[in-house]
């Protein structure tokens, strides 16, 4: 099989019995657009107003090649204004949204990198364990990650592999010129839910939405996942 987007070679990856056909070309155009749209998504860097279609246009005209190029778009006003659907106001809104994204929480930043199997809740567990120290996370080995409750060998290997790949190291060095992590307040809340895993479902009476309940659980030390598994304590 070859990749329908770039014609590159593909391979089958087997993770927990789920077989997935994956393109092996790291410069694949389809993978590139997915990595950009993941990077700007709400739970990642949260750059408002950048649809996949807009990102594709910017990639096609050479404005975006690596994810850190987002932070240099302000230097390309004329080219952006030439893109279909962009005027002075939408350009300014975009630049404002990019500027607003420059102080993410560390967990959202790690999630934004698209490290395989590292969802936002796992990123939060990792950041909490390493006391929000990004350098400690970058330098950690697999044993350090496996020592974290609910982080298994697959995630540990993915983290170590990501931070030891020269191409990714270059991306991080560039990103860190623009990004400053939000200072996390030390949680004063008693960690009564530490080590417990929750899945939030159904309708809520005492909370405005699921996100609010999720944050409350995490503040008390619990972990919220998207789906029920044998590790789930409460539904």
Regions found by a protein language model. Name each.
Residues 12-25, 79-94:
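Membrane-interacting alpha-helical segments
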Residues 56-59, 95:
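Short, well-ordered alpha-helical packing segments
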Residues 32, 39, 84-235:
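DNA strand-break repair and replication-stress modules
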Residues 1-48:
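Cys/His-rich short segments
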């Amino acid at each position: 099989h070859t990749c329908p987007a770039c014609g590159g070679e593909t391979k089958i990856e087997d993770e927990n019995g789920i077989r997935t056909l994956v393109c092996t070309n790291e410069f694949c155009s389809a993978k590139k657009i997915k990595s950009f749209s993941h990077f700007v998504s709400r739970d990642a860097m949260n750059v408002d107003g950048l649809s996949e279609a807009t990102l594709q246009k910017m990639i096609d005209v050479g404005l975006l090649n690596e994810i850190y190029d987002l932070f240099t778009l302000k230097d390309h006003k004329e080219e952006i204004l030439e893109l279909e659907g962009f005027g002075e106001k939408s350009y300014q809104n975009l630049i404002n949204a990019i500027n607003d994204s420059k102080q993410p929480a560390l967990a959202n930043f790690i999630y934004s990198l698209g490290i395989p199997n590292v969802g936002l809740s796992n990123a939060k567990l990792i950041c909490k364990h390493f006391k929000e120290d990004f350098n400690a996370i970058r330098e950690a080995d697999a044993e350090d990650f496996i020592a974290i409750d609910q982080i298994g060998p697959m995630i540990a290997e993915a983290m170590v592999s990501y931070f030891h790949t020269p191409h990714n190291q270059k991306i991080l060095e560039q990103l860190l010129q623009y990004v400053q992590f939000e200072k996390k307040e030390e949680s004063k809340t008693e960690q009564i839910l530490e080590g417990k895993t929750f899945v939030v479902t159904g309708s809520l009476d005492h909370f405005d939405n699921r996100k609010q309940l999720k944050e409350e659980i995490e503040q008390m030390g619990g972990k919220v996942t998207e789906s029920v598994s044998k590790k789930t304590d409460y539904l």
